[in-house]
Every structure is written in structure tokens, then in C-alpha cells.
Amino acid sequence: MIAEEREYATYSSMPSVSYKIIEHLMTNPKAEIIWKLLKYNDADAYTRPNLTQKEKAALIYKGEAIQADYRVFFDFMMDDAETEMNTILRIYPAEVYPINRVTGLCTINFEVFTHSKINHLSNYTTRVDVIIQTLIDVLNGADIGGIGVLFFDNQASRYDKIQTIGQKPYKGKLLKMSVNMG
């Protein structure tokens, strides 16, 4: 039996990339610190008890008109002016670079923003850096069901990087990771 070759890439998994990554972060024990730092604004947030699945789900934006109650979004940029001191995580497919007709490289952006007055933690680290490092720890090389293996690797994708973003009072970092898809 001859295997049938797909003629062209459809990138059918692209719309579910953000959700699948969040699903992985909600169930991975090493990602608990991310959820604590998103929910709690105090300098000792990392010492708080782990969140329940229900508490984590309550932080994820579901399309309501008011965004202020949420911390996790599946698109780019801050849509509304933030009036409270909090931390925000945005995860979305940013770019697709076709490699050939059946496969391409999808760059996933992870934007972490926090109000400058709550960025420093009592253990002499910063909220933004801890979240970015934990995202790499949990997701680099992880097989995200239905999407593929995420990677942070300059040899595999010259687009992977971390850069500083934001403006006062919200500062942040952008992590770019990649996944092959077709």
C-alpha cells in the first residue's frame, strides 16, 4: 500500500494552538508558579497555595466585554487601558513561515506584562522573568497534543528569542517559541 501524500499544508491546528498550550500549562505541576504569579499581586505570591483548575480557568478570558477580571488571553496587544496593578499572559500564533508545500514553521508568542510596582518579588526575582523562564522550562521540547513539539532553538528557528516589551507602567517580555505544522 502506497502512502498518500498530502498536496498542501492546511495549518488546521493553528486556531487551537493557544488553547492547547494553556491546557498543558493548567495540568503541568511545574507551571503552578505561573498561575500564582498571575492571580496574586503581592511580593510573596510564589508562596501561596497552588490554584485549583477552577481558579485557573477563571483567569482565562472567554470573550466578555470587560477584560479587567482576566489574566490570560489568546491574542496580541492590550486592548483596554489597565487601571489595576496586575500581570497578564498573552499566548497566540504570531507568524507562519512555509518551509515547503506540506509543512511550515509557526512562531508562538508569549507576552508577559506586569505593572512595574508589583514586578519585584520578595525572593529577589521578578515576576516577568520567573514566568518567562517557567514557560521555557515547561514548554521547550513539550509535545502539545494535536499541535506538535514546541521548541526554543535558534538552529531550528532563527525567530526564537526573548525581548523586552511594554511601556510604563506596564513592562514585560516577549518569548517567541516555534512548532512545525502543516
Locate the predicted segments by residue.
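Small/polar-rich, solvent-exposed N-terminal microdomains that initiate assembly or binding
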Residues: M1-N100
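Short, flexible/disordered intra-domain loops and linkers
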Residues: R6, N119-T126
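Soluble non-cytosolic domains of exported or imported proteins
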Residues: S12, T126-D129
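Acidic-leaning, charged glycine-interspersed low-complexity segments
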Residues: E82, V128-G182
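Extracellular structured ligand-interaction cores
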Residues: N86-I88, L105-T107, Y170-K176
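Residue-level recognition of well-ordered beta-strand positions that form the cores
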Residues: Y92-A94, N109-F113, K176-N180
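Short glycine/proline-enriched loop/turn "hinge" motifs that connect secondary-structure elements
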Residues: Y97-L105, Q167
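Short acidic, glycine/tyrosine-flanked loop/strand segments centered on an H-E-D-like triad
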Residues: T103-H120
